[in-house]
Amino acid sequence: LPVPDYTPQTVATREAELNAPPLHAEWHEAARQRHTRDRLAVLSGVWKSILVDRILATVGADRFSAMPDPSLATNPFSAICRQLACLYDQGPPSVTNPTAEARGFDVAGLTRTITRAGYWARMQAQQRLVLGLREVLVHVAIDEGRPLFLFATPDQVVARARPERPDQPVRIEWLRKARVDVAGAVAGTPAVPELRREQWTLWVWDVADPEAPYHRVYALGQGQWRSSGMGAAAEVSGIDVTEQLLGGRFDGDAYPFRRRPTLREERRAAELGVPAVGVPILPWVVYHAAPNGAAIFSAYDEIELFDGTLDVAAKQGFVDHAFLDASWPQRYVIGAVPVGGSVHPDDAGHVAHVPTDPASVLILQKLQDYDGQPMIGQYQAGADPAALQGVVSGQIEALATNAGVAPSDVQRLGGTARSGVAIALSQGGKRDMQRRYAPVFRDADERLVALVATLWNRWSESPEGLAVFGEEAPPAYPESGYEVHYQSLPLSPAEREARRKDVLERLAAGLVSRVDAYAELHDVSREEAAVRLAAMDGPDGDDDDDDADDLREELVAALAALEGALGVDGLPRAAREALEDARDQARAAVEG
């Protein structure tokens, strides 16, 4: 049989088939891009060429030619990531900012804006990508007062960080397609619409030097591209088309993505007689699947699950081959020949074809030149598909365990051996996964809410925003201090009763406060529980509530700790400013 058109040469063209962005010239960046691209293909269902590569490497071309077309049905990598991604299943998380709300800021309005833009709904699907690719980046922009969220996978991005904070990018390079007039950019003339051609471009945001940030766009050539360094020393192998695509330059003070100037920055600017500008920021948020303080990307984490998926999918192809072609006894004939059947033409003439299906009846005729008694027999079946399938299912369950899924949290769908592929988490297992991933995603979500507030404030202060609001003063949102709390999966009646009984018993024994008990029962923060209890108690409630006193004491202690931290010499400027903002918020909460 001829080998299907899945040779390594045709498989190597899958980057072009998937319209993948060009690879970086540095080998480690290119390797990361390729590996991430393969993971994305498996998660997206376009990985047949990758699977064929693995089968060819496992069994060789001759044995592969006898196998059926590879099936993509066995994909534990995608299935497990889908089951683990349950943090946003119960709807949008609650977003609070106790300090800002006490000052009268409309935090609920910002929350509604983000929800209506569809962000939390999209995160239900994007969390699966984060878990599979280990990182996903989100670009935030404001268009006519509405936030826009663009998700970028790591194979489209190169990011750089300072050595002292290797997990926080200060430069992001994003590969995107755009229509540009390269000749006009080289000549320095206005772009001609008829000469614009779609090609890969590199969008760069750089805040490595807070005094000289910039946002630029470069048109890339064919093949690999190069970039190195950051700040003023950065180099890119492309043609600058910033003015052609963005309509201007955004370097230095013209860089638009900034936080609101602090009082200290305003005083410093007034002394120098220049306008006050805030600290430049990147309009990006990086989502991690696990805490990673050593690097921005962790592309090879959990590679066992990805590699194991290719292994079991290749073995599943062999199981299918055994089931279709070797699961019944093979017949043999000595001294006789089958008769009848259908005749099919071929290159050499006409060939008679007699199907030997297990359900067929063979009519045999003795060979004229055979002197002995014809013999008919059969060998045993070449393979036991049930036993082979059991091995594959066991490996899939082992992959789920290695991914952090406890066997007690897995409920199988169906009763067949192959149901091991369709692993589903129980409700209790999903709640465990929510608790596992909430701290990691909460940090990114809180950064994103603060980033939306910051960019919205800058937009509302721009001529476009002022034109929308006219004489009415646009609302301003706080640019820090947000807290995100996720909605956990509901408990069953039995689980709910057991939790209520346990909390009430501990409350009666004096082991927890009312605030802690309410927070545990309703799955909210301690601060929000205190606010709700105060509202329930009403204006005639006990002003000497122990929980309120405890909360105030904690705020006073935090304020003292912040004052002490600010007294340390040699603090970096950014760290000192962050501490000053936190101190101001704590002081306002104590005074309020």
Question: Where does each model-flagged region fall?
Answer:
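Extended, regular secondary-structure scaffolds
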Residues: 127-133, 137-298
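Extended, charged amphipathic alpha-helical segments
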Residues: 244-425, 466-473, 480, 485-491
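Extended amphipathic alpha-helical segments with heptad-repeat/coiled-coil character used for oligomerization
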Residues: 425-506
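Long, highly charged low-complexity segments enriched in Glu/Asp and Lys/Arg with interspersed Ser/Thr
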Residues: 516, 520-547
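Long, hydrophobic or amphipathic alpha-helical segments
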Residues: 548-559, 565, 569
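Generic L/I/V-rich hydrophobic alpha-helical segments across diverse proteins
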Residues: 555, 559-562, 579, 583-586
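Charged, low-complexity interaction regions
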Residues: 564-578, 592
